[in-house]
Swiss-Prot record:
Function according to Swiss-Prot or TrEMBL: Joins adenosylcobinamide-GDP and alpha-ribazole to generate adenosylcobalamin (Ado-cobalamin). Also synthesizes adenosylcobalamin 5'-phosphate from adenosylcobinamide-GDP and alpha-ribazole 5'-phosphate.
Topology within the bilayer: Multi-pass membrane protein
Organism: Pseudomonas fluorescens (strain Pf0-1)
Gene designation: cobS
Reactions catalysed, as given in the entry: alpha-ribazole + adenosylcob(III)inamide-GDP = adenosylcob(III)alamin + GMP + H(+); alpha-ribazole 5'-phosphate + adenosylcob(III)inamide-GDP = adenosylcob(III)alamin 5'-phosphate + GMP + H(+)
Origin: domain of life: Bacteria
GO cellular component term, pick one: plasma membrane
Family from the record: Belongs to the CobS family.
Record-listed E.C. numbers: 2.7.8.26
Protein's recorded name: Adenosylcobinamide-GDP ribazoletransferase
Species lineage: Bacteria, Pseudomonadati, Pseudomonadota, Gammaproteobacteria, Pseudomonadales
Length: 243
């Protein structure tokens, strides 16, 4: 069970304490539990959505978004901000992009990107609440964290050393693909046709963002992985709200 606790601690802000320093193998196996963590977050959001029934719509959507951000501790938003600054400030240069990505300060591009992504998420949540598409709250966090597993299965990690390298080097790849297949099946059981739309959108966004990473960096980093999750979740939410 330790890999599950590692995944919960790393991906969320829940008060999880590990019994000791995990081994690289345990870190790698924790990736297999990322979709399960996403499912847990989704169930929490779905339950909150039910509890908020009758709340004014704008407040309803705002509270859902706030809890969504709090569940992850804004970890992935931080990666999105760093990636946005680095992508524009890097001027197409790999080393410059990686250097800017490590800078903890956020520039105007990062701020604008965060505002736009959160605004689109909020608007999509508002529309989904009106349309009573509550199952989206379960499957979107699941798909987003399954995408992280897919990214590490298909993409090299470009920063030597550290947590990301351990995740990439010790991920059980055959089991990883099986977990992705099960995750897709769970989405289909939960949301039916809407899950088909969500999965297709997720695959398209995943392929596009992965292509950008590989072309610029030759692989992924922790920051670009976080950016992928945020942009993919936002895109799927908007897509479900529109279709």
């Amino acid at each position: 069970m330790l890999p599950l606790w590692i995944a919960l601690q790393f991906l969320g802000s829940l008060p999880i304490r590990l019994p000791g320093m995990p081994t690289p193998e345990q870190l790698g196996r924790s990736l297999l539990f990322y979709p399960l963590v996403g499912l847990l977050f989704g169930v929490i959001l779905w339950a909150l959505n039910i509890a908020l029934a009758g709340t004014p719509l704008l407040l309803h959507a705002a509270l859902l978004l706030a809890v969504w951000v709090l569940l992850s501790g804004a970890l992935h938003l931080d990666g999105l901000a760093d990636s946005a600054d680095a992508w524009l400030g890097g001027f197409g240069d790999r080393e410059r992009t990686l250097t800017i990505m490590k800078d903890p300060r956020s520039g105007p591009i990062a701020v604008v990107t965060l505002v736009l992504v959160l605004l689109l998420k909020f608007a999509a949540l508002l529309a989904l609440i009106e349309q009573q598409q509550s199952m989206a709250l379960i499957i979107v966090p699941l798909i987003g964290r399954a995408a992280l597993l897919g990214l590490f299965l298909t993409t090299s990690y470009v920063r030597a050393g550290g947590l990301g390298q351990a995740l990439a080097d010790h991920l059980p790849r055959k089991t990883g693909w099986q977990v992705l297949a099960v995750s897709a099946a769970v989405c289909l059981v939960i949301a039916g046709f809407n899950a088909v739309v969500a999965l297709l959108l997720a695959v398209i966004v995943f392929i596009w963002l992965r292509h950008l990473m590989v072309r610029r960096l030759g692989g992924t980093t922790g920051d670009t992985a976080g950016a992928l999750l945020e942009l993919l979740e936002m895109s799927v939410l908007v897509g479900l709200a529109l279709f």
